[in-house]
Amino acid sequence: MLEYYLSKIVKKAHMRAIRNSEIDKTAGVCAGTQIIDSSVGRYTDIGYDCVIVNTIMGNYCSLGADIRIGGAAHPVHHVSTSTVFLKEKDHIKKKFAMHSFQQFERTIIGHDVWIGDGAFIKSGVKIGTGAVVGMGAVVTKDIAPYEIWAGNPAHKIKDRFDK
């Protein structure tokens, strides 16, 4: 029982990191979550240990824990996928070439979207208003409003409401 309470204290002490982002004052962001170059709408609730990069998120969204949204892509059409051949700034000091490549595509999440624990959302994906993404889903395609998706890779399960 003591271990349970100690784990809760450690979890709460884990800090969150918000960089270059706008979080509405009514939104909730749990410990361990990183939000980078993003905006989060009103009354949106984000669970523990999420990573959200280059994302616009609407109002009234609910996100579980351990979710990954956005992130860098790599140039699979180039000779190498390494970032040492790209001109974008990153943590690598010496670059070998200066090819242009957009590493971070903007991800759009509509209003009232529910994303379950452990989901992965690829950068550049658009998730429509009222959509539901199941836990552990790997979303690589756009999701229309009010659709329910799950699986790896994620696929449409059904519409949220009858038409």
Where are these regions (language model features)?
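Flexible, glycine/small-residue-enriched loop-and-beta-strand segment within the central core
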Residues: L6, V10-A13, I35-V40, D45-V125, ...
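Conserved G/P- and acidic residue-centered "switch" motifs that form tight phosphate/ATP-binding loops
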Residues: V133, G151
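Conserved beta-strand-loop-alpha-helix hinge in the C-terminal portion
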Residues: Y146-E147, P153-K163
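Glycine/proline-rich loop-helix segments at beta-alpha junctions forming the active-site rim
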Residues: T129
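Extended, small-residue-rich solenoid/repeat segments and analogous flexible loops
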Residues: M1-Q34, V84
